[in-house]
Structures are given as C-alpha cells and as structure tokens.
Amino acid sequence: MELWLGRLWLYVMLLLLLLQLCQDQELLGPSLQTPSEEDQVPEGLWGPWGRWASCSQPCGVGVQRRSRTCELHPALSLPPRPPRHPEAPQPRGQGSRPQTPRDPQSLYRPQPRGRGGPLRGPASQVGREETQEPRGAQRFRVRDPIKPGMFGYGRVPFALPLHRSRRLAHKPGQPKDSSTAEETLPSQPPSTEPASEKHSPHMQPPELRAQSRSPSAETPRSGTAQTEVPSRTSSAPSDMGIPAPTSSFRDSRSFQGSPEPRMPTSQGAERQPHPFSPVTRSQLSRRHWRPPGSPHRSPDGWLPLTRDSSPHWSLFAPSSPTPECSGESEQMRACSQEPCPPEQPDPRALQCAAFDSQEFMGQLYQWEPFTEVQGSQRCELNCRPRGFRFYVRHTEKVQDGTLCQPGSLDICVAGHCLSPGCDGILGSGRRPDGCGVCGGDGSTCRLVSGNLTDRGGPLGYQKILWIPAGASHLRISQFRPSSNYLALRGPGGRSIINGNWAVDPPGSYAAVGTVFQYNRPPREEGKGETLSAEGPTTQPVDVYMIFQEDNPGVFYQYVTSAAPESPSTMPPALQLQPEMLRGEPLLPSAPRPVRAPGTLQRQARIPQVPPPTHVRTAMGSSAGYWKQVGHSECSASCGKGVWRPIFLCVSRESGEELDEQSCAVGARPPASPESCHRPPCPPYWEAGEWTSCSRSCGPGTQHRQLLCRQEFGGGGSSVPPERCGHLPRPNITQSCQLRLCGHWEISSPWSQCSVRCGRGQRSRQVRCVGSNGHEVGKQECASGPPPPPSREACDMGPCTTAWFYSDWSSKCSAECGTGIQRRAVVCLRSGETLQGDPEAGSTEQGCPLRSRPPDMRACSLGPCEKTWRWYTGPWSECSSECGSGTQHRDIICVSKLGTKFNVTSPSNCSHLPRPPALQPCQGQACEDQWFSTLWSPCSQSCQGGVQTREVQCLSSNHTLSSRCPPHLRPSRKRPCNSQPCNQRPDDQCKDSSPHCPLVVQARLCVYPYYTATCCRSCAHVLEQSQLEPA
C-alpha cells in the first residue's frame, strides 16, 4: 500500500513539473528560441503539379510552364506561431514594446557590376513605394574597352562605347547615400537592359538542377511604405505574377564592365535578375510582383513568359516552416497556338531589329540574325549588320521560346538550349528504352522468340503469329529460301505487306507507328525472307504465311514490356505451333521451357506466373484461386472454330472445388475465346466481288471470280475446282445498268443570222444531259438518237449594194520623184462583200462600174538627188570543200538617181565604209585524200616524152595516211611532147607575150600554156635541143 502511494505521489510531482515547464515556454515566446530551432530545415513533400500556363507566344512556337510547391510533411506540421508584426497581440506577461520609426535597410548588398547602374522598378501592389533616383546618376557612360572575342569575324578598327547615351546634367539635390554608391559604378539607362533578361524566367536546366526551396508565403504587412535600396537583383520582372523561386545557378557573366549592347526596352521598365544568380531569402522578401492577369507585352510584340501566382516564403515571418524538397519545382514544354502570318519575321529577326534605332560604334545599322554558331552560342542573340562582315552579341540569351536553330526541335529557355524528352518536357532527358517505355531502364523488357516448324496447312494465307502492341526490335525470318511469302496485316485485317493475293517488292512499309523492312534475298544466297522493325508498335499485328509449299521453318523474336496481366488473358499467339518459345528478361537469364522434339504445343504463351500470395481483398477471400479445368464445346462442327476456357474456384490447400464466393471475383481470368480445329468441312463455291459495270450508262456486264474453297483446321484455303464439281456453279457474269444513258437537250434558242442581208448561218447550243439533269460527255448520248442540228441556214432578204473604200496608204511607192498611193475599194451588200468575180459588179445585184472610186493616185516626196552607195554581190562558194576556206564577193560603187542605178568609180563611194569582200568559211569535215606535186619537165621535147610527180595520201591534219580510196589515186606519170621533131614553125606560131624570153630562160616551155603563148620562142628552143648531141 505504501509503495502504491509513493508511486502516485511521484506521478503527481512529475505532472506539476511538466505543467510549469510548458507555462515558462509560453511566457518566453519565440524570443527565447535557440538558433538551432530557427535554422532547422524540415523535410517536405512535393505537392501536385499545377495546371499548365497559357502559351507564352500568341503565334508560332512558345513555352508552357507548370509548377508545384514544397509542402511541410504532415507528420512534421507545427502549430502556428504568433506573427511578428506590431499589430499582432503580444504574449502574456509582456507589455507593448515601443516601435522606433526608422527606414528599413536592405539585407542584401549587391556586388558592384561593371555594366549598368542600380535598377529601379515600379511600386509594388502591396503598398510599397519607389524612391525616385535623381537623373544625375545617369550621366555616366560606359567607357569599358572592347575585349577580344566580343565580335565575330572581321575587325573593329577602333574602340568606342557601344551605345551612346545622352549626358544628363547633374542636379545638386542628389542624396548622398545614392551618389556615393553610384559614383564608382558606370550608370546605364534602363532602356538598354536586354529584353531577354526582362522576359527570361527562373528555371533550372536538368543538367544543373539542385535542391530548390519553395516555402509557403506570407505577404508583408500592407499599409507600410518601404523604401528599397536599388539593387540589380531586387526587382522582379514586370511580367511575372510572383517572385521568382530560388535558383541554384551562379551568375556566369563576368562582374567586369562589358560594352555589349542591351535589348532596348521602354523607359522605366522593370528588370529581372539574372536567372542563374543566387537568390536569398532577403531578396525574395524585397521583390514586388505584379498582380495576376496583367501581363506585360514587350514593344516588339513578343510576349514574356508568365507564371501563376502562388504563396512564397516571407522574410517578415521567419518563424514560418521552410520545408526542403529534392527535385524540380517547375516543368516546361513547347506549345503553339497557331502559326504566325507569313509576312511576320521570325523571333530572332524581331529581336535583332529592335537594335536598329540604337547606335553601335557611333552609327546605326540594320541588324539581321547571325545563326552560324555552335554550342552554347545558339541561345545568344547574335546579330549581323546587313552588308557587313562582322556580327555582335547583343544579349547573352534570346527570348524564351526561340528555336535554337531554324528547323530544330530544341528551344532556348533562359539562355540554355533544351531538347524535349519522350514525355514532351523540355530538358527532361527522358528517352524510350528498348521496349518503348519512356524513361524506362529496360528492367521491364522481355524477349519473346521461337521457331515455327509445323509443315503448314492448305495453300493460301495462313496466320502463324500474333504480335502485341508495344513490341519492338521485331525480326521474323524464314530458315531457307522457299516459294512461300510472309504477309503482314494490321487491325481489322488491313493489309500491310503482301496482301490481296499480290506480292509486294522488298522495301520499307510504314504502319502501326513503325516502319517494317521487307527483304527477299536472291535464292543463291541461301537465305529466306525477312521482316524486321525497330518499333514500338502502336497496335497489334498478325503475321501470315502465303503457303505454296511446306513450311521451311520460321524464326521470330520481339521485345515487349512485361505486362502485369496473367498469361491466360493474352490473345492467341500462333496457329502454326512453335517449336520453342522464350519469355525472359533481357538482363537476367531464365530457364527455357523444355519440350520433347517432334511434339507441338496447342498455344504458345509466356510461361505461367505462379499463383499470387494470400492477399485478402474486398471482393472475396484468399481461400481459393481460379483454375482452368477445361474448355467449352467448339463453336464449329468442322474446320476452325473457337472455344472458351472454363475456370473453377479451387482450394489452395486441398485442391477441392469451392463455391465462387471463396475466390476473389475481381481476380477471375476472362474467358477469352481460343481457336479450335475440327475435321475439314465440305468444299463450297466462294464468289468474289462483282466488278464494275462495263458501261457507265445503259445495259452492261459485270464479272466476278469464282473459287472452290474448303475449311480446314488451320483456316480456309482454295482447292481445285474439281472438288466442287458436284455443286451448282454460280454465275460469273450478270447484266447491269448503273443508270439510263443521257439524252440530247437544246439549251439555247437560235442565235441571230450571221449576215444582215442575203443568206447566212445561225446556231444554237445542244448538249448531252444525264438522268440527273446535269451535262455529261457526248459519248453518253452516242447510243441514243442523233442530236438535233446546232446550225442552219438563214435568209435575211435581198441586200442593197454600194462601193466602199479605205483610206489611202500612208507611204508613197517612190522615195523621191513621182510615186503611187493605193487604197482598197470593195462592193458590199449591207455590210457583206460581194461573192465572185469583181466584174460581177456590173450585174443587177452588183455595183455600177461607172461610179467605182479610184484605187490609185500619184504621189511625190520631192525631186530626186543623186546618191552613191556600195553594192555587194552574193558570196561565192567556199574555196575548200572541207576544212577552212574563204569566200569572196564583188563590191561595186553604184550611183542612184530616182529609180535609176549606174555603176560608177569606187572613188565616189570612198566616203562610205566599204563592206568586206572576203570572209572565212568552213567546209565539210575533211577526209583522207590524195595529194600530188607539180609535174616534172617533159623528158623529151618532141616525139613523146614522160612527166612524173609524187602522190601521197594525207589525213586532215596533213599527216601520212593509208585510208585513201585506191581507185581515186592520181597517176604518177603521163606522156608529153608527142609532136614530131624537125618541124619548122609556121606563120601561125607567134609569140603573144612580151615576156617570152623570160619564159625560155625559166624553162617553162615544157608547159602547154607557155608553149601556146610563146610558140615561136619555144619552137626555137626545141630545135636547138634536137640539134645538140645527146
């Protein structure tokens, strides 16, 4: 009893002590918390993904975002602590503390940066105001030198500030604290801030993702005016709905000055910190944000990315729990609302054109994109001035949503080129594994393979294999060449390869989400047909064999993802039974089912999965499991049919049959139909589809194909027609009439007569109209009655006649002197010409000749003056029958007086340019021909002598040849001086040339021409040669 009282007293004392400690903790409040409590970071859980934001661009390619928040784990949730605001109630036991009015100071002091001064943003929507910085702080200009590598190829001759800003007068009323902080830094107007920074979101590429925090938010107390210290990272972008989350990236840009031009923006636009600079909690608390629903559009029409507003951690409530989650807090994907108009430039061109009004190196340029870059430079805004050979990096990153390169799928986001993964998320890096699972590691892949060695059934198409959807790395091949053909059918029996009794050529065939390669090697190679595809397939396909001989054996294999369903739920795989089937993971090896050679399996399946463990469900107990005990009756009495498996609930322990309530109803396998085979059915006639009618209208004929078929266990097949000889043979032709043929219809009345008097022609439109009233071709009415006439003669009565004449010709027939002018005169009958001979005008129906107007008259352009001109004759024939030659023509000076021409002295035409008298010409291609020299002197002066010469065959280039025709070879000898000797010259033999003595000296008397010209001189020479002794 005393022991029990002692224990009771001890429990009471411990309870009182515990109450006292709790009261002291409540009185002290948060001011006595240890630093370890404040700095402790609880582990959180990711909340669900939010909705995808709207596309960032109204047309073309843009970016969509969605985010999730890191929430405190439910097991670590703490009661809310009293807020630290002056208007909040104080803890018990403490009075109100006096509030000292003072300007709040920034907890983050930005590092000095070479380009750009302090940035300013508009007032926040939660009550903050912005201090107006004096304009004197903007009077400094960038004076940094140009560094190597800043420009592209080509050289800049001298270094100047890239952009000139107007010097602003320094106002004396500038605050000291701002001037001291700015005088050491070059100032830059807000208008030169790059648009890419203004619009770039805070994101984390997957290759650089780190742990990010998304604490719950607590907005600052409204109503208090806060003065912000200017900071490069203090103001949030004007187009963002919320402060940007913490990023783990470091600013990769140099803190030194850079003369790079910045994207021009509107004056006073808000600036966004670099997306890769670290953001602290103090920065998050000092960023103001634009209320949702007020996006800001840049001047060039390019929309920035926006984010949905969500609560964030607040500096003014440091006691709020700050959970930490690992993983990404934001995802992005490409989007496109509608294509941009063709006349609108691409985004890069718009961004480059924004610098057309901004000076660079002291002058203005028209900028166009420069895309001949690689690597990380693809997401920089590199622009080239038109007509110049250098380019400039205007901004370090293009606007989000810009394509990395024209025609690529990669998109620039925050200066990084991100590629879409198989899940559509930019930068996810997910790729399908070997069995088509997006982001899979291949652990779920299973290789299914086997050999089909059954001899086969009847001739024709026979299904041999079923391939499920999602299969990849397919390969089906025959063991050796044969007359059989592999065929492929898709869902609904749609033919893919070798369908409709037609053999397709080898090649590529696209179907069910992949491309099948059909290969048929020559028989001498000793290889059979092959079907292969990389996959994965989007729908199941059936593999058939067109049997024309016994099956030589078929090997098949494919990779598929392991399905959680039981093997009995899979559709039938084969009708020709396989010799072997493997269902095993790709990485670990599994035992293969062993079967005695020569036996056949009824169905080829993945090996049976062991029965599941005892798991009780709401639909039934685990006392039994479903076991297949047989099949129903076959649905066909002959040929091929189907039956369904019968499942019973069997005890797991004793194997006895139980009632169905003892097994889980949801785990009962479906009774999928399976193929069954009965004895062959009697043959029957199978008629094909009727062909089109032989005529498009009227009676015609149709034909169809008739086959004798018989159903076997493996399916239907064509058999010889003799087997169906005892059956009545259906007709293979029949009469048909699609519609009545067309008829002729008059569609317009008669036109006016072609003449106003006399006999003429008139016409009307006649068309062939079908049964529906529409016009058809004339051949549709060819079988009917002839068409009504469309033309006929018409008589407009007698015509009145009169002479009609035209104007005189404008040119006189003579250039000078008297000439003739002509005009046309006709006799018309009410506007029509008189038919027949013009003399018919003298008849009663013609015009009287006595009143015919004259058709000629004299004309004169003035007296004629004598002129001279060169007259050229026709060119002569080419001097050479082949090869190059010359042509000549006669040129004379002719004087002209009126129509008279006289030949005169060439000196009268000397003032005129003389036409050429010679010109080169080209004959036909020269063939090899005979050439000969001059004849030698005659060997005797009388009583017959001999002359000789050389004869050679030369080619067109004057080289010796042997291809000249022998029958055209000139003779090498000829007789000469056949006159008798001792003849005195008669009186008729005289010299007709004064140069005969020279002819004698030159010994030219041997030639007939000179003998006749200098007869006497040559006769004396002949006499002297005869008198001289031999």
UniProtKB/Swiss-Prot annotation:
Record PROSITE patterns: PLAC, TSP1
Glycosylation-annotated residues: N451, N731
GO MF term list: protease binding
Signal peptide feature range: 1-24
SMART domains, A to Z: TSP1
Compartments, as annotated in UniProt: Secreted, Extracellular space, Extracellular matrix
Record's protein name: ADAMTS-like protein 4
Organism: Rattus norvegicus (Rat)
Encoding gene per record: Adamtsl4
